[in-house]
Amino acid sequence: MTDAAWDTVLRRTLPWIAAALAVACQGSGKSASAATARDTAAKAATFVEASWRPPTEADIPHDSLGAAIRRGLYLLRFTPESLPAYATSSLRCTSCHQNDGTKASAAPLTGAHARYPKYMPRSGAVIGLADRVNYCFTRSLAGNVLPPESRQMNDILAYLAFISHDVPVGRDLAGASGLVTMKDTLVGDIARGEAVFKRECVACHQADGQGTAAFPALWGPRSFSIGASMAREERAASFIWHNMPQSKPGSLTPQEAFDVAAFVNSHPRPDSPGKETDWPSGGAPQDVPYATKGHAPHRPPASLLARRTPERTIVPTPPVVHGGAKSEP
């Protein structure tokens, strides 16, 4: 069975595994846990995504948990200002995960709490949600690993759990796989992209692409790294087509979105140490701009900028288990 197939099986069976484990504990005085698991399984069977809405900021409770949730939301909104040692670019979490992580066309975070742990082909391992958050810190924010045991990580996870309220374990909501896949298979033109950029993007991101206090840099030392999803042409085109310009999203054609993506990603940007070990089983998407197993780089940027502390930018991959024996991937 393929890794993708195992991931599908895992997601479909997690609610029932949880219920079975809780029932097994019932004889040890864990009847409350069993009842909770049965309730979770019942909710999974009756969950209707079309009528579900994520909680809003106004719904955050006024207690200790609510305080952690609010801190987590603040960290998403003001990431480099709050965590300058870990988010060293000009991007915030909400630069990509718009509407505080709830916008379906902008890599929504809703439901993430219910989907992890899960298998990630890029890392070739099953990872937890804290590791997935750190992939954003080290790649999309071109920063450093946020300690998983830190209060800040706990606050971020509290917020992700909050906006996933009532989503059944293992359930994939719309947008769960990240940015919406573009239906058109197009090739961006850098020269055309520059023209569109000058016409539609400079008001926020400036002619030099370095952005402003409110809008992030799109290339250079304070932008996303080559290891970020946004450094891939099709992924960037999807984000641009669905969400940009912010004042009139959806006004560009798919070809214009690909052209702008090609132009933006042709510029220098931070390196992503360890990127050559991505997709260890092969199968990297066609538009990945760096070499991996069996994959040649697709239109790499003009140059890569060295990271100040490369040893702090790599999220440790969980050990692979074969027949009960652990081995490093």
Locate predicted features:
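Post-cleavage N-terminal segment of exported redox proteins
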Residues: 2, 11-73, 79, 118-190, ...
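Extracytoplasmic electron-transfer domains, predominantly the class I c-type cytochrome c fold
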Residues: 36-37, 47, 66-71, 75, ...
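Sequence/structural segment immediately N-terminal to covalent heme-attachment motifs in c-type
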Residues: 64-100, 185-215, 233-236
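Surface-exposed patches in mature extracellular/periplasmic domains of secreted proteins
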Residues: 81-88, 144-149, 169-173, 248-255, ...
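Secretory-pathway/luminal and periplasmic proteins that interact with or process carbohydrate-rich
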Residues: 82-85, 100-106, 163-168, 267-274, ...
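A structural motif
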Residues: 129-130, 160-173, 203-211, 229-236
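Short helix/strand-bridging catalytic loops that position acidic/His residues to coordinate divalent metals
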Residues: 178-185, 215-227
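Carbohydrate-binding/catalytic loop surfaces
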Residues: 281-293
